[in-house]
Amino acid sequence: MAHGPRYKVPRRRRREGKTNYYKRYVMVLSGKPRFVVRRTNQYIWVQVIIAKPQGDVTVAAAHSRELVKKYGWLGGTKNTPAAYLTGLLAALRALKAGITYAVLDIGLHRPTRGARVFAALKGALDAGLEIPHSEEVLPEEYRIRGEHIAKYAAMLKEQNPELYEKRFSLYLARGLNPEDLPQHFEEVKNKILEEYREVLEKVKAEAAVEA
């Protein structure tokens, strides 16, 4: 509750942990599209947004549940591989819409090295979207492919089968052995890349001309 004449009640979205208004202000002033990454306890979602006088315009977007519904993803929808694939998908859609450059907007998420928000960034970079960044924050390749999850699952299956079935019940219910997650990741990634093959070829051709 507010106390004192100088106390200012934070704006609603700041109180809800959704918006850092100062960072948003700086990014809007830049005039560049924002590559917005957000996560919940269940999902990852990514949007490419352009600020207009009348309000924000979403140019492209992707949600991790799309991976399940459209691309046959059998793994979790909030982990590092899912974040990467969601970022990849959103970036390809942005490129298709003619957006080639954006600035990263992670809102109030902590910029922890290797975090899921940076896995989404890595997906966008691999798609060909140009986003200023530091290489140090990006997750290592083995984490993006889910090898750490597969290794943990294999260990757990051997040492504690009951806990293994409990921890990976979602994977098993969908018909995926978590030990096979890296291979499954590559399959889904290739599906996405194949769908946007023409976009990727166009980006490569334009890059070759500029070079």
From Swiss-Prot:
Part of the 50S ribosomal subunit. Contacts the 5S and 23S rRNAs. Gene3D superfamilies: 3.30.420.100. The keyword Transferase does not apply. InterPro entries: Rbsml_uL18_euk (IPR005485). Transmembrane segments: none annotated. It comes from the Archaea. One of its GO terms (biological process) is ribosomal large subunit assembly. This is one of the proteins that bind and probably mediate the attachment of the 5S RNA into the large ribosomal subunit, where it forms part of the central protuberance. Pfam families: Ribosomal_L5e (PF17144). One of its GO terms (molecular function) is 5S rRNA binding. This is Large ribosomal subunit protein uL18. Belongs to the universal ribosomal protein uL18 family. Keywords: Ribonucleoprotein, Ribosomal protein, RNA-binding, rRNA-binding. GO terms for cellular component: cytosolic large ribosomal subunit.
